[in-house]
Structures are given as C-alpha cells and as structure tokens.
C-alpha cells in the first residue's frame, strides 16, 4: 500500500471532474481520461467470499494487484476521499450465480442487496499508458477512441478456496522497434500489472482471433506491429463466471474507477 500523506496537496480536480460526470450518467471507456491519475478495476463481493478473493489475488498478483480493500459494508476508498464506489464508475456489471445479470450506470440498488459487501480495487494497465504515450508509443484504442481489447487465455490462475479461472489479458499493438521500450516502461509499474506477460503469437495463449476479443473492442494492427499482451484486471470477472459466484458487482471492462492517486505513486 502506498503512503497517502505526501499526496494530500496533489491537485485532483481532473479526477474529481471525471467521477462527477460518471455519477451524472456519462458512459465511456476511461482509457485516456484524467491522464496522470491511477485507474482501478473493481470487484465487490459479500463478506463470505471476500477472503477467497483476497487469497486468489495474493496468488495471482500479476492479474489481480490489489490497491485497496474496503471494510465490509463500506462504499468508500482512501484512494479517492469523498467518492462513492456505487455511483462514480461509468458502467457496472451485476453478476448472479456466475452469469451477467445486468449492466447499470448506478449500482446503488444492487449494492443494497447485501449489507456486508467488500470492495476490492485492483491495478489497471491504463495507469502506464500515459508514460507510454509520453515516450512516443501510440496506444491504438486511445487514438481510435475505442475500448481496449481483452481476451480470455488458456493460462490458468492459481485457484484459491472456491475461486478458479483463467487469466484475461489486454492487448496493444506496438511497433516491433518499440516493444522493448513498452516492456521497460510498463515494467516500472508492478502494482498495475507491470511488464507484458506475452508478446506475439496469440495462439500460444489460446487466442484464436484477435478481431474477436471477449471483452472490449478490436483494434487495427498495422504492418510492422506486434500484439503485446498484459495481465488484465478483468481476470476476476473470469473467475466469477468459472466459479459460479452467487453475487458480485464489478466494473464493466474498460470502464474504470479513477482515483486521486498520481500514476507516479506506483512507479517502482
């Protein structure tokens, strides 16, 4: 966990403004929004499942790097004082018995079904996109104003308690000459997935067609570019599906919680 005291004087207006827009009903992928602020995936579970997930995350830190865990029944986080986790993401998913039951812009009603929900905020690779762009590496889904493509792989996560599932990865096409740079830059952010888990050869990790991601939108891959894959915080949603979790609330893939924490706080 990062030390928060020295961050109290950071100007967080961009992050607050984005969250206010989402609370008012704006729906959009958050890649490229409030650049410079850490974004987080989210999964919310009844207390009975919280330890299983905490153990799952501990055993699979590349895919599930935990940034914060709430107290049971709380809908707040120290990563953004004053924010409401029920309302301040652009889009939520509600899961019942391992199946997607609904998507909503306000999770208050679903949240009220269980008095003891525990929220987990998980590092997101959007956090290191800003330094990659600053280094001159194009991020295609930002250029095209689309969602990042995400794929379910054949890479099994370590099970924990009642939870099991395979890793989900995000993909960014990178010019061959810049792959090492992309790996170096992202590798400096181990708390938000870190360096790539796979480069090229998508079939080796069970991806049959890059044009058909399980989550998000497909993106163009230009000549001379290589698909580069990072562990992804949608992995918990794959575990919800594979494990038949009775109830969960998550972010919708690509629609993150924007924190008040600067990206630089997670720079190793």
Swiss-Prot record:
Disulfide bonds: none annotated. It holds the Pfam family D-Glu_cyclase. Its EC number is 4.2.1.-. InterPro entries: D-Glu_cyclase, Putative_hydro-lyase, UPF0317. GO terms for molecular function: lyase activity. Gene3D superfamilies: PSTPO5379-like (3.40.1640.10), PSTPO5379-like domain (3.30.2040.10). It comes from the Bacteria. It is an enzyme of class 4 (lyase). Keywords: Lyase. Belongs to the D-glutamate cyclase family. This is Putative hydro-lyase Arad_8587.
């Amino acid at each position: 966990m990062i030390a928060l005291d020295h961050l109290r004087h950071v100007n967080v207006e961009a992050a607050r403004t984005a969250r206010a827009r989402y609370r008012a009903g704006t729906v959009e992928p958050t890649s490229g929004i409030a650049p410079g602020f850490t974004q987080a995936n989210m999964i919310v579970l009844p207390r009975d499942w919280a330890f299983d997930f905490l153990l799952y995350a501990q055993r699979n830190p590349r895919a599930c790097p935990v940034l914060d865990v709430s107290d049971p029944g709380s809908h707040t986080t120290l990563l953004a004082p004053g924010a409401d986790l029920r309302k301040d993401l652009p889009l939520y998913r509600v899961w019942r018995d391992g199946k997607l039951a609904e998507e909503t812009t306000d999770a208050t009603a679903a949240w009220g079904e269980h008095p003891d929900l525990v929220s987990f905020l998980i590092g997101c690779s959007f956090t290191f996109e800003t330094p990659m762009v600053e280094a001159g590496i194009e991020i295609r889904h930002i250029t095209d104003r689309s969602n990042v493509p995400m794929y379910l792989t054949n890479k099994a996560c370590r099970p924990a308690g009642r939870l099991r599932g395979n890793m989900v990865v995000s993909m960014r096409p990178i010019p061959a000459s810049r792959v090492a740079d992309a790996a170096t830059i992202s590798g400096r952010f181990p708390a938000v997935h870190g360096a790539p888990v796979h480069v090229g050869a998508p079939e080796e990790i069970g991806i049959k067609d890059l044009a058909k991601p399980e989550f998000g939108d497909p993106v163009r891959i230009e000549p001379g570019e290589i698909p580069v894959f990072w562990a992804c915080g949608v992995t918990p949603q794959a575990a919800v599906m594979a494990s038949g979790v009775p109830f969960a609330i998550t972010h919708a893939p690509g629609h993150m919680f924007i924190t008040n924490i600067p990206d630089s706080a997670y720079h190793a």
